[in-house]
């Protein structure tokens, strides 16, 4: 006798249902999928797929992956790997320190989908919370560096240093091709600088910082505090080098700047560094938000994003991303940087650390760190041991002890490891001990006993040993936001008030084309705060991180199975970084064959702007290839240009499915053509959500591909970062993947330098993708791809009678996204794609991608995670908006093209309850245009933002409180 008429419940296997997560991730079950198929004219999924995905690219075999695991089983398996990680107390330093993230910030920001599932704040009206948090971050950076402006974060300290070098060349009036680097910089920073400089033809000169005075350099970069922990006043050196038209950047420890004289006071043009010490776990290297501060005159040359203060249509203060046309991916062929993302979630965490602790709190923490280091140095000095010598008198947190012999240094180092402490070796005889905000009395006892054989207690008085000339005298963090939220209740409510201003995926679908805003499941997110993954230093001894490396190796094997490639590099910490690493491998490969002149890169005109920007960074000549009327690469033009540049052809950069959202029939032919002429095929993985289980990029001819783990493999977008962009490559390119000075990659050549600061990039978020793949299994991953394709085609079919669908494949099908053309409606009514985007906010939705890859269009990518009900709400909103536009054109009910719900959108609660309603439509039409909105209303916190005003009156620091009243 069975307990159910459902056969699946007649066996224990069915009762356990290991594949249950698959149906939690997918927005529609089998019955709903049947409804979707029926709506577009199909009776089964197989027929639909056969007419959507070209037969020549199809993968007619199962992925070499295990079947799905349950959430519990996947977490248990990951736990076994985490248990194989030893978390010693880290006193390594070298740019990474243990921290204490305030619990109120961890729970209410890092672990809150209202913060981590949002997209980059291009739609400012529904992103005021994140924008305010980022403005706080910028204010922290401005205050501590003393410079006039700061960006909203870069990827990490080392890449920020490389960006400073590129910016120096843009801004400097020097004709020199040499860039000076202080020999006191961290090795990983120099590694990334060398990588970036090579293909621009810049010579990196490394030496004692005083030597910068005598050379002719377009830029100079100094470290403050140095790799040995020493603090040097750079004022005289900076003044001297600036006389030679040298642009000066200073890499600064953010926590040290709480006490030390600011870079601006010493004359720096740029200050940069990591904000990891402001409450962000080390995470085996990342993710962390780098800061980048600069002078006002350099604002149009600075990399990355800048948050600025503007006004909305009602005259109220509103925030936005400022000067967007200077972003590198928009500048395309004119760029010398491809930066198009940042670390928003991490920047918000760091900014909130300053908000919660306030000026007094951060000064107490910084002073405690320094006092620990001073007390430790005093113990060593007072021991009167001739073998031990403290190298520097002026330091912030790191004390370097010369042990006099390699034997003694090795003995102390090993003894420290034996009792659970990691120190750092500098050469044969020197040990560095870097104190942090987690240092305590027990640590002090242990560390002193390691060096002088007797445990010492902390002295009663906390001594500051820095000379007064090194200390700052100006006030920091004086804005009210840093002085108002120091109790947990106040902080909790402040965070909630910001969260409520933002529309994230915990509210509704975000259908941004080419962005893949899919479910970020809670079970995928849980492991990132496990101490084993969060609290490990990237340069910890390898025998302590066996489980971490095992997890990363396992993820690499998963990605190899999915893509068909022979090897994977996990170092790139963004999609753009992955592009860079991919082209870098291609250039190095050609050089290994003696073909140094293969410097032409073919790029379809529809490509994302990072593609030509990346090619320019690699010293390549960009040749644009036409696309045909169906959105495909023009094969005739590609053939002609391949033949024209045959002897110099280095690479083709291509996105598949195309940026136009179509599976190109001729992708194999395209790859064969490039190979025939000696080039390599770089595939952009932005649209990989249409590939997984359906095809393999290596199989169709790609040589290298970057994978956006923050798109296809479920790392959340974080409101604009973090991301990960690992690259898969064929065997002939594998030796040329990025390496690392301090942690070499086993199969990369020694002379291949790094593309990011840490060996594995943003390692602590890799468990998210590992969990996703493990829980979906080979069959679930294919189901996800099928449903992503089905959802996009359902949306296209439902909207095609209202908005033209711009591109389709041979059988009238799109891939995983579709482009609807707004230009005919705009020509007829004057209503633009921007008006539609703003009006969608009133309907509770974030706009699809605007005007990319075609101006005057919207690109929609619903992903597999959205239900039919949510798709139908979105479709009904777009249909209703079309009807509103036509009503305005017809002049019904006194609506006009100049005064209607679209051009006045979005409507805030303040507008709707205003006693004087002057619009020709009702308040209900403004705020509740469809019935579903009544039960789930999202109110934009500001009306339409004035972009022109914001750029003309640029203000990128926190406004006074009166501006909000």
Curated annotation (Swiss-Prot):
It catalyses: N(6)-[(R)-lipoyl]-L-lysyl-[glycine-cleavage complex H protein] + glycine + H(+) = N(6)-[(R)-S(8)-aminomethyldihydrolipoyl]-L-lysyl-[glycine-cleavage complex H protein] + CO2. Its EC number is 1.4.4.2. One of its GO terms (biological process) is glycine decarboxylation via glycine cleavage system. The modification N6-(pyridoxal phosphate)lysine is found at residue 711. Its cofactor is pyridoxal 5'-phosphate. Keywords: Oxidoreductase, Pyridoxal phosphate. It is an enzyme of class 1 (oxidoreductase). GO terms for cellular component: cytosol; glycine cleavage complex. It comes from the Bacteria. The keyword Lipid biosynthesis does not apply. One of its GO terms (molecular function) is pyridoxal phosphate binding. It holds the Pfam family Aminotran_5. Belongs to the GcvP family. The glycine cleavage system catalyzes the degradation of glycine. The P protein binds the alpha-amino group of glycine through its pyridoxal phosphate cofactor; CO(2) is released and the remaining methylamine moiety is then transferred to the lipoamide cofactor of the H protein. PANTHER family: GLYCINE DEHYDROGENASE (DECARBOXYLATING), GLYCINE DEHYDROGENASE, DECARBOXYLATING. The glycine cleavage system is composed of four proteins: P, T, L and H. This is Glycine dehydrogenase (decarboxylating). The lineage of its organism: Bacteria, Pseudomonadati, Pseudomonadota, Gammaproteobacteria, Moraxellales.
């Amino acid at each position: 006798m069975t307990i159910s008429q459902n056969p699946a419940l007649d066996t224990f296997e069915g009762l356990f249902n290991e594949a249950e997560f698959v149906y939690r991730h997918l927005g529609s079950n089998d019955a709903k999928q049947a409804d979707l198929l029926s709506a577009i004219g199909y009776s089964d999924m197989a027929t639909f797929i056969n007419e959507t995905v070209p037969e020549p690219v199809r993968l007619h075999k199962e992925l070499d992956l295990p079947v799905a695991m349950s959430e519990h089983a996947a977490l248990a398996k990951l736990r076994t790997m985490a248990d194989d990680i030893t978390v010693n107390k880290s006193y390594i330093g070298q740019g990474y320190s243990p921290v204490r993230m305030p619990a109120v910030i961890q729970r209410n920001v890092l672990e809150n989908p209202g913060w981590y599932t949002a997209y980059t704040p291009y739609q400012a009206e529904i992103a005021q919370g994140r924008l305010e948090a980022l403005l706080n971050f910028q204010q922290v950076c401005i205050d501590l560096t003393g410079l006039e402006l700061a960006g909203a974060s870069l990827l990490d300290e080392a890449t920020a240093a490389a960006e400073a070098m590129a910016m120096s060349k843009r801004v400097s009036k020097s004709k020199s091709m040499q860039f000076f680097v202080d020999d006191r910089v961290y090795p990983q920073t120099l590694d990334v600088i060398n990588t970036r400089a090579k293909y621009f033809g810049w010579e990196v000169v490394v030496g004692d910082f005083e030597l910068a005075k005598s050379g002719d350099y377009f830029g100079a970069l100094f470290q403050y505090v140095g790799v040995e922990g020493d603090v040097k006043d750079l004022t005289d050196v900076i003044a001297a080098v600036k006389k030679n038209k040298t642009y000066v950047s200073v890499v600064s420890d953010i926590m040290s700047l709480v006490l030390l004289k600011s870079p601006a006071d010493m004359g720096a043009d740029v200050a940069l560094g990591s904000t990891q010490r402001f409450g962000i776990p080390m995470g085996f290297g990342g993710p962390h938000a780098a800061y980048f501060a600069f002078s006002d005159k350099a604002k149009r040359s600075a990399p990355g994003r800048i948050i600025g203060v503007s006004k909305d249509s009602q005259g109220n203060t509103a925030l936005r991303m400022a000067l967007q046309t200077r972003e590198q991916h928009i500048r395309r062929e004119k760029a010398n940087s491809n930066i198009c993302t940042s670390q928003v979630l991490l920047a918000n965490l760091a900014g909130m650390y300053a908000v919660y602790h306030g000026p007094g709190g951060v000064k107490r923490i910084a002073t405690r760190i320094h006092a620990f280091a001073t007390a430790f140095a005093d113990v060593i000095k007072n021991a009167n041991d001739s073998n031990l010598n403290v190298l520097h008198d002026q330091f912030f947190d790191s004390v370097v002890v010369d042990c006099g012999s390699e034997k003694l240094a090795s003995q102390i180092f090993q003894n420290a490891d034996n009792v659970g402490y990691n120190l750092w070796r500098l050469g044969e005889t020197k040990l560095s001990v870097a104190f942090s905000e987690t240092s305590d009395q027990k640590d002090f006892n242990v560390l002193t006993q390691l060096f002088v054989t007797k445990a010492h207690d902390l002295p009663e008085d906390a001594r500051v040993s820095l000379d007064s000339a090194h200390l700052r005298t100006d006030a920091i963090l004086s804005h009210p936001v840093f002085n108002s939220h120091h109790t947990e209740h106040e902080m909790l409510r402040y965070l909630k008030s910001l969260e409520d201003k933002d529309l994230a995926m915990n509210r509704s679908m975000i259908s941004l084309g080419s962005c893949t805003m899919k479910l970020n499941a809670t079970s995928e997110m849980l492991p990132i705060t496990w101490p084993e993954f969060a609290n490990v230093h990237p340069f910890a001894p390898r025998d302590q991180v066996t489980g971490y490396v095992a997890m990363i190796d396992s993820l690499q094997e998963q990605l190899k199975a999915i893509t068909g490639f022979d090897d994977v590099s996990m170092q790139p910490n963004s999609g753009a970084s992955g592009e860079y690493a991919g082209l870098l491998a291609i250039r190095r490969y050609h050089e290994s064959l003696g073909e140094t002149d293969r410097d032409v890169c073919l790029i379809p005109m529809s490509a994302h702007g990072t593609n030509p920007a990346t090619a320019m960074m690699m010293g390549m000549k960009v040749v644009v290839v036409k696309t045909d009327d169906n959105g495909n690469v023009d094969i005739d033009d590609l053939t002609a240009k391949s033949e024209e540049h045959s002897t110099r052809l280095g690479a083709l950069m291509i996105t598949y499915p195309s940026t136009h959202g179509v599976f190109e029939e001729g992708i194999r032919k395209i790859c064969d053509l490039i190979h025939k002429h000696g080039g390599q095929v770089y595939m952009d993985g932005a649209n990989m959500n249409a590939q997984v289980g359906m095809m393999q990029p290596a199989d169709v001819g790609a040589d290298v591909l970057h994978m956006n783990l923050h798109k296809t493999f479920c790392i959340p977008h974080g409101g604009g970062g973090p991301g990960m962009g690992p690259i898969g490559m064929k065997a002939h390119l594998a030796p040329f993947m990025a390496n690392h000075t301090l942690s070499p990659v086993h199969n990369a050549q020694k002379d291949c330098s790094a593309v990011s600061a840490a060996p594995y990039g943003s390692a602590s978020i890799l468990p998210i993708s590992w969990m996703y793949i493990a829980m979906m299994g080979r069959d679930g991953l294919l189901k996800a791809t099928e449903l992503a394709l089905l959802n996009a085609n359902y949306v296209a079919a439902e909207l095609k009678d209202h908005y033209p669908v711009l591109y389709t494949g041979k059988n009238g099908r799109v891939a995983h996204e579709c482009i609807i053309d707004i230009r005919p409606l705009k020509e007829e009514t004057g209503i633009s794609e921007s008006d539609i985007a703003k009006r969608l906010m009133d309907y509770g939705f974030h706009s699809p991608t605007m005007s990319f890859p075609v101006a005057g269009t919207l690109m929609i990518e619903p992903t597999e995670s959205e239900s039919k009900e949510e798709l139908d709400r979105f479709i009904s909103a777009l249909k209703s908006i079309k009807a509103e536009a036509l009503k305005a054109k017809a002049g019904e009910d006194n609506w006009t093209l100049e005064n209607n719900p679209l051009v006045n959108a979005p409507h805030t609660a303040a507008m709707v309850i205003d006693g004087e309603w002057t619009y020709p439509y009702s308040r209900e039409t403004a705020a509740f245009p469809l019935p579903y909105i009544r039960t789930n209303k999202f109110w934009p916190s500001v009306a339409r933002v004035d972009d022109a005003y914001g750029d003309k009156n640029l203000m990128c620091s926190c406004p006074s409180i009166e501006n909000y009243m």
